[in-house]
Amino acid sequence: MSPLKQFEIFPLIRLPEFFGWDINFTNSSLYMVLTVVFASLFLFAGVFRGKVIPGPMQSFVEIVCSFVLGIIKGSCGKAGSDYFPLILSVFLYVLFANLVGMLPLPMSFTVTSHIVVTLALAMVVFIFVTLIGLKKQGMGFFAMFLPDGTPNWIAPLMIFLEVCTYLFRPISLAIRLTANMIAGHTILKVIAGFVYPTSLLISPLSFLFVVVLIVFEVFIAMLQAYIFVMLTCVYLNDSLFKH
């Protein structure tokens, strides 16, 4: 089986077209729902019957929340704390989307392996931080496109380059996540495929290598969620403060 077959989208429930749009419930739709369900259950497990002396699950959820809050404060200071709910939601969605795709479930699918999903998420972040910048700084927000001390003769070129760089942010954010998920899952699938045809002597070593690779892929999944949120906070910092 092709290692790229795991990225194919196919309908699970066929629905009538909506003004010419295909709105079938696909394997991608299923795993998006599962991602939200798992992320919601994770948070619910942390707050359900919360105690002054937290149990293991409550402690773990609090550690994750504190970790995300630390990223926000490290990039944006206390002013960024107001946006903690959204940043936490983005972090958990990316994290669980990456991890759920690695579970041995039927029709296992990683939604973040498709650029349309990551680009949509990146556009939400991009529009959000842009609106925050316009609200906080007003017309002064556009000053970020012309660095202080820029000579007048080169100002038009600098503005053009800065605007292009700003508009490219969601694209780079989406491509980075998608490329890493595709590469990691493809390599894992290819190497795992070598375990079956190898001899009994080599198979245990191959299996051990696959286990190590899975652990590494889990690390990459968590790292990509961290990078996505870190860059989101960096962009938020640009919108909150004049530079």
Swiss-Prot record:
InterPro entries, per the entry: ATP_synth_F0_asu (IPR000568), ATP_synth_F0_asu_AS (IPR023011), ATP_synth_F0_asu_bact/mt (IPR045083), F0_ATP_A_sf (IPR035908)
TM regions (residue ranges): 28-48, 52-72, 83-103, 114-134, 141-161, 177-197, 200-220, 221-241
Major localisation: membrane
Bilayer topology term: Multi-pass membrane protein
GO molecular function (one): proton-transporting ATP synthase activity, rotational mechanism
Pfam family of the protein (one): ATP-synt_A
Cell location: Cell inner membrane
Origin: domain of life: Bacteria
Amino-acid biosynthesis recorded as keyword: no
Keywords assigned: ATP synthesis, Cell inner membrane, Cell membrane, CF(0), Hydrogen ion transport, Ion transport, Membrane, Transmembrane, Transmembrane helix, Transport
UniProt KW Amino-acid biosynthesis keyword: no
GO CC annotation: plasma membrane; proton-transporting ATP synthase complex
Purpose of the protein: Key component of the proton channel; it plays a direct role in the translocation of protons across the membrane.
Protein family according to the UniProt entry: Belongs to the ATPase A chain family.
HAMAP family: ATP_synth_a_bact
Quaternary structure annotation from Swiss-Prot or TrEMBL: F-type ATPases have 2 components, CF(1) - the catalytic core - and CF(0) - the membrane proton channel. CF(1) has five subunits: alpha(3), beta(3), gamma(1), delta(1), epsilon(1). CF(0) has three main subunits: a(1), b(2) and c(9-12). The alpha and beta chains form an alternating ring which encloses part of the gamma chain. CF(1) is attached to CF(0) by a central stalk formed by the gamma and epsilon chains, while a peripheral stalk is formed by the delta and b chains.
Family annotation (NCBIfam families): ATP_synt_6_or_A (TIGR01131), PRK05815.2-4 (NF004482)
Protein name from the UniProt record: ATP synthase subunit a
Lineage of producing organism: Bacteria, Pseudomonadati, Pseudomonadota, Alphaproteobacteria, Rickettsiales
Gene responsible for this protein: atpB
